[in-house]
Amino acid sequence: MIRSRARAAIVVLSCVVVLDGASGTLHEAFNAAKAYAYTAQIAGFGERPPGSPGHQKTQSLIREVLKTTRATIESDDFTATTPRGPIAVHNIIGKYNVTADRNQPIFILAGHYDTLFKKGFIGANDGGSSAAILLAFAEALAGRSTRMQIWLVWTDLEEAIESFEGDDGLYGSRHLAQKLKAAGMAPRVKGLFLLDMIGDKNLNVAREISSTRSLQDVIAEAAAQLGYSRYFFQYETQIIDDHVPFLSVGIPAVDVVDAEFGRMGPSVDGMGEFHHANTDTLDKVSQQSLEIVGRTILLSVELLDQRLARR
């Protein structure tokens, strides 16, 4: 992903709102220790650009967890035309609580699992934490009912080959979004939360300004209920990320992204000193940050699921 607008601070006045009947079962089932362990395992695979051994090991891990948690597993495979030549791309989808109702609403939790084509780049946070937290979501979803069909989507080739200009970057998400549109399924998707770089020890999730505000408000509500408001939406920025292709086909979406990874300033990358640097290693990732984001996002899904039942 790439930052495309300067940071703007926000002063937030938050209050705790408690909804009647909130069970908390899904968000309480989230295991941050497992999310961190998965992050460590994925980072241990080394570099993970498409086609690499680390990339293939990550795919195998994802499929193994989806099989164990009894997800309906689908693949979205295609060959992307890139500045580097043709590249095989593999989006992986795990579906939970699928019913026979062809109009059953869908909610997507997504994150990319590839890393840059850059020698020595491990991407423990950028690519590692997002893939790992989805694996922990799979375990939380296993055996728990929701009215919505929940999709976990691991997008591939999110990273640009040269730069996020024209059609370079977001290859997997662009393909999947267009596929949903062509199949007439986009209206069934009530929303998408994209998770990116959410393992940062100094967690500070941006209010990404192209994202769907009403869904951001649900996240803010969930964070307030859990006492996590200070970690969310304290500044605004605009990010070109995997949520953008879904917005373009009419799917509400939020980029849940920590856009300040390490020291900020004119002499470093616009998203922080560790962004796209070989210093994006496991020591920069925090189990506490994974817990804050994981519990908040799953409580947000619960709140949305409850509201669907009231319609």
Predicted feature residues:
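Acidic/histidine-rich catalytic neighborhood of metal-dependent amide-processing enzymes
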Residues: 117-222, 226-230, 238-243
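Soluble non-cytosolic domains of exported or imported proteins
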Residues: 29-36, 49-60, 124-132, 167-171, ...
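Structural recognition of the beta-strand scaffold that forms the well-ordered cores
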Residues: 93, 107-110, 151-154, 190-196, ...
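Active-site-adjacent substrate-binding region
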Residues: 54, 79-81, 191, 200-311
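Solvent-exposed loop/turn segments at secondary-structure junctions
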Residues: 48-50, 79-82, 100, 113-117, ...
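Bacterial Sec-dependent signal peptides at the C-terminal "C-region" and cleavage site
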Residues: 7, 13-30
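A non-catalytic alpha/beta surface segment that caps or lines the substrate-entry region
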Residues: 37-97
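N-terminal capping segment at the start of a domain
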Residues: 25-59, 69, 114-115, 195, ...
